[in-house]
């Protein structure tokens, strides 16, 4: 059996760890090459072309197998698995029960932990943190300072970068792009060629799809849908069952005379969202008059204006 081994363990200068030394040529490894560190032989399969290069460490019950490679100063530990033709390198950290498979790449200072699955041709880099039971697959790309957790799913050709955060059961797929400080959670879905950026927040069962773009400080939630080529920016607050398909499907006003709060009107349901209020224009004016006459007069001017142009 020893004659069939492709490497042996040799002492190292790190307590509790050995280095791997190639016993034959395979892949880009030559007989006699000294690789990275392992805790025991179970950390690196004797089969396939898998290898640990440089000062990379694989320890605990972690396993590198098939044709996967780990190099640089990367660390793989816990019960993690790096298999198929996956690559983990630079200062990347893979912990717990993570699975990195297919042609997936994890690099730079990325951290992937818990029960995360990274597979297919997915790539994770920068200082991205992926945790809990999140899945990144397909040709998805996650980078920069992104945080993805809970049961979030990123797949297909989706791209998530900047300081974006995605959690809950949110899904981002097709060729959707998320960047800036965008936050997406709940059961929200971002699909098609949609773009979410700036400080936008999308949650509940909201859907952003097709070629729609949402940015700035826009909030989209409940069962609202932004679709087609709609461009929703500013401080819009889209909720309820609103559907926005174009720039003409919503209007945002600012209360410049007192509180500075924003009013959002959506055409599809003819509803207004102002602070905690959500309802018809008539209901909004009635509520404003109940607070004080001056407020009622100003609110009525806004409602009347919108009704005059729709």
What are the roles of these predicted feature ranges?
Residues 1-72, 77-120, 125, 131-135, ...:
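Extended, small-residue-rich solenoid/repeat segments and analogous flexible loops
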Residues 1-49, 254-310:
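Terminal amphipathic alpha-helical/low-complexity segments used for targeting or macromolecular assembly
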Residues 236-258, 284:
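Leucine-rich solenoid repeat scaffolds
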